[in-house]
From Swiss-Prot:
Higher taxonomy: Eukaryota, Viridiplantae, Streptophyta, Embryophyta, Tracheophyta
Location in the cell: Mitochondrion
Cofactor(s), names only, from the UniProt record: [4Fe-4S] cluster
Membership in a protein family: Belongs to the radical SAM superfamily. Lipoyl synthase family.
EC number: 2.8.1.8
Matching PANTHER family: LIPOYL SYNTHASE (PTHR10949), LIPOYL SYNTHASE, MITOCHONDRIAL (PTHR10949:SF0)
Residues annotated as domain Radical SAM core: 125-345
GO molecular function: 4 iron, 4 sulfur cluster binding; lipoate synthase activity; metal ion binding
Catalytic activity: [[Fe-S] cluster scaffold protein carrying a second [4Fe-4S](2+) cluster] + N(6)-octanoyl-L-lysyl-[protein] + 2 oxidized [2Fe-2S]-[ferredoxin] + 2 S-adenosyl-L-methionine + 4 H(+) = [[Fe-S] cluster scaffold protein] + N(6)-[(R)-dihydrolipoyl]-L-lysyl-[protein] + 4 Fe(3+) + 2 hydrogen sulfide + 2 5'-deoxyadenosine + 2 L-methionine + 2 reduced [2Fe-2S]-[ferredoxin]
Protein name (record): Lipoyl synthase 1, mitochondrial
SMART domains in the record: Elp3
Pathway: Protein modification; protein lipoylation via endogenous pathway; protein N(6)-(lipoyl)lysine from octanoyl-[acyl-carrier-protein]: step 2/2
């Protein structure tokens, strides 16, 4: 219907144009210009009445013709009251930050914008200061949808002085417990496992009393890489499965998967000296169901993992996957209780918990010390 109106109007315009052209080349009576002007005025009026307007293409929700919603993006979920963050500070916090800048070292605390940075670096309520140092550079070869770390297929080569710098820095801070993690380095022949091992060994040589948790990538499931790091002298071998089995492909890089991660944790338990703890972590609020969480916990426990942590997924930026749900503190408590009933030696579960959050708290430290005393 609308297109037929356009054709009629176009035909009338052509007729008017021909008459206008004819009047410019021939001499007519004085009444011709008057007739032409009347025809043009009539066409303008008809065009104004029949031309399509904005309302022909959209349905308006209000009297304001231009008050329309653009796009289909969902509004982000508002943060609930229990997700408040504390402001970093304290003498130990300042000391650690200054030393990091001097030695050009990276921490996952800063790279991942962890909300617990201030509490961990300053020692929090227990006075046990912890930090998570990120080695092998600040650029990852993978691109998980939840992670804020930079990515590249060809990141810069590792700094050969990094193991020494990291060991000396941590030894000077007097930390009771440190987490050493790294980006994925699929570009390196040994996935960075040699660099990781050297860092742990140098720190243990300088400060044997410091408990070391190595939060490692999956090394693409390479048993030789896992064995090398497991026997480096660490106290806790950690590798995160990140989310429930059903959401792996939606959350993690395509080179990571649930089975591969479980295999890494089982290999670590086999290769590491007796008394070495294994640990993993998952984020909640990515779209998982309670049943999926429980099934994942059962499989992790069956793999012999000692420690498991649960925390709320927090979207680092608008470029990352949105938060599907904010899990209540009560739900986190239930998963903690269930985990202990399943046989995990320790479960940390709460909205603000991260894989290395309060890693050096008194309970875990006491557990490691107790195990060693019993075996000696």
């Amino acid at each position: 219907m609308m297109y037929s109106r356009f054709r009629t109007v176009a035909g009338n315009l052509n007729c008017a144009a021909k008459r206008l052209s004819s009047s410019s080349t021939t001499t007519t009576t004085t009444s011709a210009p008057s007739e032409l002007q009347q025809n043009l005025a009539a066409l303008r009026a008809r065009l104004a009445m029949e031309s399509p307007s904005l309302s022909d293409f959209i349905s308006l929700k209000s009297d304001n013709a231009y008050s329309v919603e653009v796009g289909t993006k969902k509004k982000p979920l508002p943060k609930p009251k229990w997700m408040k963050e504390s402001i970093p500070g304290g003498e130990k916090y300042v000391q650690i930050k200054k030393k990091l800048r001097e030695l050009k070292l990276h921490t996952v605390c800063e790279e991942a914008k962890c909300p617990n940075l201030g509490e961990c670096w300053s020692g929090g309520e227990t006075g046990t200061a912890t930090a998570t140092i990120m080695i092998l550079g600040d650029t990852c070869t993978r691109g998980c949808r939840f992670c804020n770390v930079k990515t590249s297929r060809t990141p810069p080569p590792p700094d050969p002085d990094e193991p020494t710098n990291v060991a000396e820095a941590i030894a000077s801070w007097g930390l009771d417990y440190v987490v050493i993690t790294s980006v994925d380095r699929d570009d390196l022949p040994d996935q960075g496992s040699g660099h990781f091992t050297e860092t742990v060994q140098k720190l243990k040589a300088l400060k044997p009393s410091t408990l070391i948790e190595a939060l490692v990538p999956d090394f693409r499931g390479n048993a030789e890489c896992v064995e090398k790091v497991s026997k480096s002298g660490l106290d806790v071998f950690a590798h995160n499965i990140e989310t429930v089995e059903e959401l792996q492909s939606a959350v993690r890089d395509h080179r990571a998967n649930f089975k591969q991660s479980l295999d890494v944790l089982m290999m670590a338990k086999e290769y590491a000296p007796a008394g070495t703890l294994t640990k993993t972590s998952i984020m909640l609020g990515c779209g998982e169901t309670p049943d999926q969480i429980v099934k994942t916990m059962e499989k992790v426990r069956a793999a012999g993992v000692d420690v498991m942590t649960f925390g709320q997924y927090m979207r680092p930026s608008k470029r990352h996957m949105p938060v599907s749900e904010y899990i209540t503190p009560e739900a986190f408590e239930k998963y903690q209780t269930l985990g202990m009933e399943m046989g995990f030696r320790y479960v940390a579960s709460g909205p603000m918990v991260r894989s290395s959050y309060k890693a050096g708290e008194f309970y875990i430290k006491s557990m490691i010390d107790s195990d060693r005393a019993a075996s000696s």
